[in-house]
Amino acid sequence: MATVVIVGSQWGDEGKGKMTDYLSQEANVVVRSQGGDNAGHTIEFDRQKFALRLIPSGIFGENTTAVIGNGVVINPQALLEEIKYLTDRGVDISGLKISSRAQVIMPYHLLLDECQEKAKGAAKIGTTKKGIGPTYVDKVSRIGIRVADLLEKDTFAAKLKQNLEIKNQLFTKIYGVDPVDFDEIFNQYYEYGQQIKQYVTDTSLLVNDAIDRGDKVLFEGAQGTMLDIDEGTYPYVTSSNPTAGGAPTGAGVGPNKIETVVGIAKAYTTRVGEGPFPTELNDEIGDYIRETGHEYGTVTGRPRRVGWFDAVAMRHARRVNGMTYLSLNLLDVLTGLKTIKIARAYELDGQEINYYPASLAELDRCTPLYEEVPGWEEDITQVTDYEDLPANAKHFLDRIVELSETPLATISVGPSREQTIILRDPWRG
């Protein structure tokens, strides 16, 4: 068997789509295992750029099966819009498969997300208001509606009625907004179910059979380690597990089926929304990196917060993911900087620490301890061999490897598939 999990090792937006695009050239199956349409990824294919939110990047591979697994929460309206977006641009989506066990984002989840965020005021966490959190809450509360339920008219009606009895009480008595209408939701979402029915199957069976046959299976992550509900900067996190452990549970396979974990990172750090960010840059250098790296959200368009590479957070990601390799993106963005900094440790209350604190209060008191390395002026966007990189760029990469305690698999020097330096092939170890 050959299985590779791709995880974001920072706060998301690390460029996982490019690595997925590269590895999916050989993959037989590409699986999305968690999250929803709150996370966007951009893929270059056939000289076109595609911004996807739900459908796995493997949809562009010839004879590749693209799976939306049971751990994903699906907004069927967003999914159908994405299907149309792809088919209108000539993409064959016959390889798309959707888990019958995946949870469905309903209109009341979207409204509840908005009401809850507004009620928090200054304590808001910066949700994308896509209904992700409320959908996962219903899943854990065992009242969620799954894709399989959409296809059974009586089951869907009963579950929807039960949910609206609870949700409309919240809307009218707690949040002071109008209730949502049963008939409108039922008719619309039952029709959505009929439209996606042709793609729905037992994806756990499909993926396990593929692995047992010796097919190459790629697990495509969304968000990033530092947004993980357990291992991230809680409560400023997503509602699922973007770490490597979330891949087998969200795809319906055993953990012993996972062979290789590739962590994706930028040569610097970004995050969107609220929450701690020890290496954040609020100066001209931060502005330079943001503009040069086009650091604006794929889904929201929001400017991303920018900071130096954080080796403390990276070691945390290496440990909790069991990372085999690190894939470093956007090295070219740092070109032109005279000096580049890497956070090698933190100082907390006068003591040097090498771990990432769970306490937000402690994180607020942490000061990064930086190692400075010289930058480079040479254009590296056409470099395809590691040895052809400038000496200072290679020194920077050496320090990233040493401080992150993880070997490099690839280095990205531009957005296209060709602008990738391959050091190790994750499929072959």
Swiss-Prot record:
It comes from Limosilactobacillus fermentum (strain NBRC 3956 / LMG 18251) (Lactobacillus fermentum). This is Adenylosuccinate synthetase. The active site is at residues 13, 41. Belongs to the adenylosuccinate synthetase family. NCBIfam families: PRK01117.1, purA. GO terms for molecular function: adenylosuccinate synthase activity; GTP binding; magnesium ion binding. Mg(2+) binds at residues 13, 40. It is found in: Cytoplasm. GTP binds at residues 12-18, 40-42, 304, 330-332, 412-414. Substrate binds at residues 298-304. Pathway: Purine metabolism; AMP biosynthesis via de novo pathway; AMP from IMP: step 1/2. It catalyses: IMP + L-aspartate + GTP = N(6)-(1,2-dicarboxyethyl)-AMP + GDP + phosphate + 2 H(+). IMP binds at residues 13-16, 38-41, 128, 142, 223, 238, 302. Homodimer. One of its GO terms (cellular component) is cytoplasm. Its cofactor is Mg(2+). Its EC number is 6.3.4.4. Keywords: Cytoplasm, GTP-binding, Ligase, Magnesium, Metal-binding, Nucleotide-binding, Purine biosynthesis. It is an enzyme of class 6 (ligase). Gene3D superfamilies: Adenylosuccinate Synthetase, subunit A, domain 1, Adenylosuccinate Synthetase, subunit A, domain 2, Adenylosuccinate Synthetase, subunit A, domain 3. Plays an important role in the de novo pathway of purine nucleotide biosynthesis. Catalyzes the first committed step in the biosynthesis of AMP from IMP. Binds 1 Mg(2+) ion per subunit. SUPFAM superfamilies: P-loop containing nucleoside triphosphate hydrolases (SSF52540). GO terms for biological process: 'de novo' AMP biosynthetic process; IMP metabolic process.
